Amino acid sequence: MSFSFNFDVQLTTKCQQDEENQPQDGNEYSEVEPVPGITITTQDETVKAAVEHFPPATPHSLLNDAVSETITIGTLPPLNFLNESVFELTAYERDDEEMILSQTTAQCSDLISGVYEGGLKVWECTYDLLELLERDGERFAEKIVLDLGCGAGLLGILALKRGASQVHFQDYNSTVIEHVTLPNTLLNCLEEEEEEEEEEESKGKKPGKRQNNDEVIIEEEEEESMKSTEKTKSELKNKQKNEEVEDGRPHAKRQALDSSQHPKLSGCRFFSGDWTSFLSLILKEDPSLKYDIIFTSETIYNKAYYSALHNTLHRLLAPGGVIYLATKTHYFGVGGGLHLFEQFVEEKGVFDMEKLWVVEHGLQRHVVAMHFKTKDRF
């Protein structure tokens, strides 16, 4: 099995630490409505409120001065993502309301519990899960996928490239979603659009022209039309800017305008927030939303998060769906790990767990599949 990286730039940073942490879910702190049937124990009376994030009116702005790298695993499509070293070195230039970029740099830390849950880094187990998906050939066509604790979003991006009808990304930190997940998703969407354009041109279509009702429309006319359309979109967006609902989600028309910037993005949604508040937000969807596939990588490092994670998986997995959990055997210094989570899941009696792969080199790691027990499937 081939496993290769294509780095546009390589740097060595002063904060290269070990591997026993990772994401959970976020944005601003506020109280969250209780979800019927769910009991959550937290260390604080408040949790990080769930917020849905949308691509900006000019998505390309997310990629200004971006330095990317590409990972290729076997027959999987290449996955593009921001170079972590460059991102760290340029962190001071970025807007960061959560202040996690400055804190992680100052503390030379990959994890600050309850503040920053590790989403700026791609962790080892994500690569393990990608390798397993390449080996086993999971099919994503027409499926609804959730990348829970997504970080860079590589798992969700793979599903998007493999034909998933919808892919939703969730991370604890809004900074991660806005500065990492969204740009990474756009990097891959742009690549696919360029490939499609090249394919069309190779079939004989001339650049700068298109056919419409047997008339040839010159590039200059197209540009004028695009400018007019963008102006209209901008005016509509400004008009709708204040049409926010109480749960933090924008007006439906605004969603459509934002997602229309790129066809591939129309099937993507992006969320930050604690798992409890994220679950509360998703359960308000009408019609109700369930996921055929849920990815969650390196999210069981802290025992305090198990209840919120389990409840989220329980309420959002579709009947007959599958959860892919990638994890280390034990997270030294944090306390969590696979054995403790298996015990927790067994006590709840909701899911069966199946070990799909054990990785022995380095710290022992696992990829596990979770399904509803037969009585809970429907």
Regions inferred by a protein language model and the residue ranges of each:
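S-adenosylmethionine-dependent methyltransferases
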Residues: M1-F378
